[in-house]
Regions:
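Long, ordered, helix-rich scaffold segments
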Residues: 1-178
Length: 178
């Protein structure tokens, strides 16, 4: 709110200078900062230098010890620096993460084309198939279907052919009790 009415470059330089204070911030301030940076990027064109400053500051520490910070920072870094961030997120997904975290990351990875190897795409679609078998809220099946549709649309015909078995495989659902 305090930034309204200030010059665009003042906003950016003031906000970006906070990157040096990142480690000193309490988590609530880190979340506020991430949100402000995300809004700045979505509403204004920022220079390549400013993007690099954000990537350098937030990306060098990713993944963080905090799941919540990871979930807030990952979408921003996937957008700004997919070639470095996507492999880190895929590795994170291979580890022990909750269903909520996994679906969150799959959602944000769905449209990325940079930073994804054929192997990482296999991992992505295997995890997506796994989550498609889990019980969830009413909208979960539709959300996962949309993630599958959008992520499949990013594949080239060659990749679709190479991933044919992974794309077609769906783990069997457990039997419902009588």
């Amino acid at each position: 709110i305090a930034l309204i009415g200030t010059d665009h470059t003042e906003k950016e330089s003031g906000l970006l200078s906070k990157l040096t204070d990142w480690e000193k911030m309490v988590p609530s301030k880190q979340f506020e900062y991430i949100d402000i940076i995300r809004r700045l990027i979505s509403r204004h064109k920022i220079s390549d230098e400013e993007k690099e400053e954000i990537i350098k500051s937030l990306g060098k520490r990713f993944p963080y010890q905090s799941t919540k910070i990871n979930m807030a920072v990952a979408p921003l870094l996937i957008e700004l620096d997919p070639s470095e961030t996507v492999p880190k997120v895929i590795e994170f997904l291979k580890g022990d993460c909750s269903q909520r975290e996994g679906i969150h990351y799959l959602f944000h990875l769905r449209n990325s084309t940079s930073g994804r190897s054929l192997e990482s795409r296999k991992i992505f679609f295997r995890l997506l198939a796994k989550y498609e078998t889990l019980l969830g809220g009413r909208g979960l099946p539709q959300a996962l279907k949309a993630i599958r549709k959008e992520s499949t649309a990013t594949l080239t015909e060659r990749e679709k052919a190479q991933l044919r078995t992974v794309l077609a495989s769906r783990p069997a659902l457990p039997a419902f009790p009588d």
